[in-house]
Amino acid sequence: MVDVANIHLPVLLDDCVNLMAPALEHENAVAVDCTLGLAGHSIAFLKTAPQARLIGIDRDSEALGLAAERMEREGLADRFIPVHAAFDQLDQVLTDRGIERVDAVFMDLGLSSLQIDETDRGFSYSHDAPLDMRMDVSQPLTAERILATYDAAELVRIFKEYGEERFSRQIARAIVAHRDKEPFTTTAQLNRLVDEVVPQAHRPAGNPAKRVFQALRIEVNGELDKLASTLPQAANRLHVGGRLVVESYHSLEDKTVKSFMAQGLRVDVPAGLPVIPPDAQPFFTDLTRGAIKADEHEIAANPRSASVRLRAVEVSRDIPSRWRKRFTQTAQGLNDINIQGSASPGRAKNTARIRTRRG
């Protein structure tokens, strides 16, 4: 049996529970954990809110099974609904279960320790493994396929946009030149190539390939598009008084979360108007006053918490219909990208074209 409790330590657990709990105090409250993983956060939510039910979504079937077993052992299975899906299918998951509104939505965007430590998934640059990087192994797109089929311009774009890699062009050119002689099949091959390309004097702390690995993982799984699609779905599904709580682990995720939440935290009128109409008032309340970070004690106990940023908002009034419509259109457009991207290696081109049309 896998020792789940020792594999994965939930990040900022007390803060997350304190943010979620007030929305789950009433009878028949419903919470959604969009990134269930090994259920560390969700178990704490259910223990704190004994009247609540929780829907746990995860695209990793292995993690979902382990989480369900853990819920059974904790005596919480009767209030837990596991769902095998990507979190950007939130609307469909709730519709299929006849649920119109929920009370709290939680997202922990970090990789689980199970995924990082599993040697055959290729998420980590610390040991050799196949270039896979899929969170859902039923999906066709892998890191190996990207490195074999994307042209240099596509590789530059994902390394620059998703990895913020300074040497994107040099790495992309080296990949294209190398694959003509020998295909990339393992993480060790990619590690060696990046090590040869990135100058010693300009390397970030740690492994020089970490940004390339991050970029490939985001591209394989469509992570940022899925996040940008899920946030508006979550907002549209929350009751007034409902809460959206999100943990992110790199700047691209945090920027996406911060930008989305900011839409509901500001007055929706041009500057200088003498009177602000009621319908233009903010519809979110900032619960974290920016972002909560892990303190030195948590980082010492759980080094993977070092980069976390926790943000949360409460729906303070009915979201105006124009905003609901805007959220729905955003989610639908990005879901179309994800459907196309998961079936072909052209995700980068599809996304780029959509973003260009939107300006």
UniProtKB/Swiss-Prot annotation:
Its main location: cytoplasm. Residues 339-359 are annotated as: Disordered. It comes from Bifidobacterium longum subsp. infantis (strain ATCC 15697 / DSM 20088 / JCM 1222 / NCTC 11817 / S12). Belongs to the methyltransferase superfamily. RsmH family. It is found in: Cytoplasm. Its EC number is 2.1.1.199. It comes from the Bacteria. InterPro entries: RsmH, SAM-dep_MeTrfase_MraW_recog, SAM-dependent_MTases_sf. Gene3D superfamilies: Putative methyltransferase TM0872, insert domain, Vaccinia Virus protein VP39. Pfam families: Methyltransf_5 (PF01795). Residues 350-359 have a biased composition (Basic residues). Keywords: Cytoplasm, Methyltransferase, rRNA processing, S-adenosyl-L-methionine, Transferase. GO terms for molecular function: rRNA (cytosine-N4-)-methyltransferase activity. NCBIfam families: 16S rRNA (cytosine(1402)-N(4))-methyltransferase RsmH. This is Ribosomal RNA small subunit methyltransferase H. Specifically methylates the N4 position of cytidine in position 1402 (C1402) of 16S rRNA. S-adenosyl-L-methionine binds at A39, G40, H41, D58, F87, D108, Q115. It catalyses: cytidine(1402) in 16S rRNA + S-adenosyl-L-methionine = N(4)-methylcytidine(1402) in 16S rRNA + S-adenosyl-L-homocysteine + H(+). One of its GO terms (cellular component) is cytoplasm. GO terms for biological process: rRNA base methylation.
